Amino acid sequence: MDFPVNTRRMAGRRGFFSQYTHHHLAAFLLTFFSYSLLHASRKSFSNVKVSVSSQWTPSDLNSSAYIVLPNETWNGNTLFPNTKSATLFLGLLDTIFLFAYAVGLFISGIIGDRLNMRLVLTFGMCSSAITMFVFGTLTEWLQFYNKIFYCLVWIVNGLLQSTGWPCVVAIMGNWFGKSGRGFVFGLWSACASVGNILGAFLASSVLKYGYEYAFLVTASVQFAGGIIIFFGLVTSPKELGLPDTGEGEMDRAAQEEGANKPLIGGNDEGDDESNYSIQSDDVVITPKAIGFMQACCLPGVLLYSLAYACLKLVNYSFFFWLPYYLSNNFKWKEAEADQLSIWYDIGGIVGGTVQGLISDLMKMRSPVLTVSLLLAVGALFGYSHSPNDKVMNAFIMSITGFFIGGPSNMISSAISADLGRQEMVRGSSEALATVTGIVDGTGSIGAAMGQFLVPLIQNSLNWMWVFYFFIFMICMTTVFMVPLIVRETRDWLRQRRSSRLER
C-alpha cells in the first residue's frame, strides 16, 4: 500500500506512537494476554502443590482418625507414603515439564514459520487447557491416581505449552519494526509476570473448594482465550494489505537516501531498470521458511542462546524457589512469602521496559545487557545478605529482579525478534519463530538443569552456596556476551565513520 510522501512526513513528525494503528494495539493485547494465560496455568500448578501433596498422601488427622478401618480405606487412593516423597515427585514433574517444554520450543519454532501461527497458537492454548483439565480435575473427579499417567500428561502439556512463545514473539516481530522495538517488547514481555499474578489470583480464589477447581478455572479461561485468538488475531500486517514492518523500514531508508540524490545523475539508467522491474511485478512472493541449522548459523543466535541458558537458569530458579526460600530461610508464612515474591516480577517488568528503551536510544542491545548483568552480580550478593525485614527484602528483591529479569525479558523477546529479522534473512526467508524457539529452547534446558541443581546444592551445603552458584551463572552469561559487544561496537564505529565521510 503506497502512502503519499507528504503524509509519511507528517506521520513522522507526529511522534513515536503515530506509526501504530489500532491493528497494532490489537496484536499487542491479544499476544500479551494469550501468553499470560499460558503462564497463569503454570503458576496455578505451583500454587496448589501443597493441596496436591496432601491429597496424594494418607491423612491421619481427620474425624475418623481413631476408628479402626482396613488399610485399603486409609491408603487406597494415595500415591506416596509421606509428604516428602510427594514433594520430590512434584519437583520431578517440574523438571519433566521444562525438558519437554525445551524440546517443544525447537519444534514449535520450525512449525510456526511453516504454518499459520494463529492456528498453531490456538491449537496450543486449547489443547494445553484440555491437558490441564485432565491432569488436575478429571483425575480427581474419577479418583484416578497414577504416577506414570501424571508424567505422560505433563510431558504432553510441556510440548503443547511450547507453541506459545515462538508464535507470539514472531507475530509481534511482524507488527513492530526494529525502531522502538526495545521499548515495545520490554513492555510487552511483562506478559509472563502478569500471568504469574493472574494464575495466583485464579488459584487462590477457588482453592477452598478443592485444588481440582483451580485447574478447572485456569483451563476454562485458557481455552476461552484460545477461541478468541482463533477469531481475532491477525498475524501480520500483510493480511490486511498493510506494509510489512521490514518493508516499511526499508522504504523509509530508501526515501532518506533518495532525498540526498540529484534528480538527474549518471547512474540513473541502472536504477530505472531495477525500479521498473519492481513496479511492474505485482506477484506477491511468499518467503520460504529457513532451516534449523541455517537459523543456528545466523550471526548472534548461538551466543545469545548460550547466554540465555545461563541467565534463564537463574531467573527461573527465582520463579520456582523464591517463595520456598523466604519461608525456609526467614520462617515467614507461606502466604506472606508468596505475596512478597511478586516484587521480583515487578522489578523484571520495570527492568525490561527501561533497558529496552535505553537500547533503542543507543541502537545497541548487548552493552545495555552487559552493564545490567554486572550490576546483577552485586544485587545477588546483596540479596544473599538481606536482613530479616520484609520491606528491605522486597526492596533488594525488586532491584535483583530489575537487573536479572530485565535482561531475561529482552533476550527472549526484543533480541530474538532482532535476530529473526536481520538483514541476512529479511525479504527472502521466514526465521522469526525458528530463531525464537532456538533461543528460548536453549534457555529452558538451562532452566530445567537449575531445578535439579538448586535443591541439590541447598541440601548438600546451604542457601549461600546457591547464591554463589547464581553469581557464577551470571558471570558465564557475561562471558558469552563479550563477542557480541565487540561485534556491535565495531559495527557502530564503522557506521559512525561512514556517516562522517558522507558529510
Curated annotation (Swiss-Prot):
Belongs to the major facilitator superfamily. Organophosphate:Pi antiporter (OPA) (TC 2.A.1.4) family. Pfam families: MFS_1. GO terms for cellular component: endoplasmic reticulum membrane; lysosomal membrane. It comes from the Eukaryota. Glycans are attached at residues 62, 71, 275. This is Sugar phosphate exchanger 3. Its main location: endoplasmic reticulum. InterPro entries: MFS, MFS_dom, MFS_trans_sf, Sugar_P_transporter. Keywords: Endoplasmic reticulum, Glycoprotein, Lysosome, Membrane, Sugar transport, Transmembrane, Transmembrane helix, Transport. Unlike the other SLC37 members, seems to lack glucose-6-phosphate antiporter activity. The chain crosses the membrane at residues 20-40, 87-107, 119-139, 152-172, 183-203, 214-234, 300-322, 342-362, 367-387, 395-415, 437-457, 466-486. It is found in: Endoplasmic reticulum membrane; Lysosome membrane. It is a multi-pass membrane protein. One of its GO terms (molecular function) is transmembrane transporter activity.
